[in-house]
Design a protein with these regions (language model features):
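Short, surface-exposed loop/turn motifs at beta-strand boundaries within globular domains
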Residues: 1-2, 12
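Intrinsic-disorder/low-complexity, polar/charged segments enriched in Ser/Thr/Lys/Arg/Asp/Glu/Gln
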Residues: 2-6, 59-61
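Asparagine-centered strand-capping/turn motif at beta-strand->loop junctions
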Residues: 7-16
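Short acidic, flexible loop segments centered on an aromatic residue
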Residues: 16-38
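Copper-binding active sites and cupredoxin-like electron-transfer domains
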Residues: 26, 48-49, 76-77
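Short alpha-helical interface elements
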Residues: 32-34, 44, 48, 79-89
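Intrinsically disordered, low-complexity Pro/Gly/Ser/Thr-rich segments with frequent PxxP/GP/PP motifs
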Residues: 34-70
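Terminal connector regions
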Residues: 61-107
Length: 107
């Protein structure tokens, strides 16, 4: 997994959306449209405690970095709740996100 990658993110909501530095970006607000598979196991590459905010219709290119340590995600939006590197974890989370109306998960 590369150290960082860039993802283009669009806020399709009618309200502002903010994401903090610690958040598993794959599980960010369902109305943010971006390649969620590219965000798997990653967080924003910004200083701890910082936030990026999108106004309605706004687009930002963000840099993401991998989670370190044990790479287990619990909570957030409830799309993972287990090891990020487990066999089948990404396809299962993409299917759940699709079922819950998340953008950026493919057809």
């Amino acid at each position: 997994m590369p150290d960082t990658n860039a993802v283009v993110v669009v806020n399709t909501a009618a309200v502002p959306i903010a994401v903090t530095s610690h958040w598993h970006f794959f599980e960010a607000n369902r109305q943010l449209d971006f390649d969620r598979a590219a965000a798997w196991g990653r967080r924003l590459a910004i200083p701890t405690g910082s936030t990026i905010r999108w106004e309605p219709g706004e687009t930002h290119t963000v840099t993401l970095r991998p989670f370190a340590g044990r790479r287990i995600a619990y909570g957030f939006a409830g799309l993972v709740n287990g090891p990020l590197d487990a066999d089948g974890a990404l396809p299962a989370a993409l299917a759940l996100a699709r079922d819950r109306g998340y953008l950026g998960v493919g057809a």
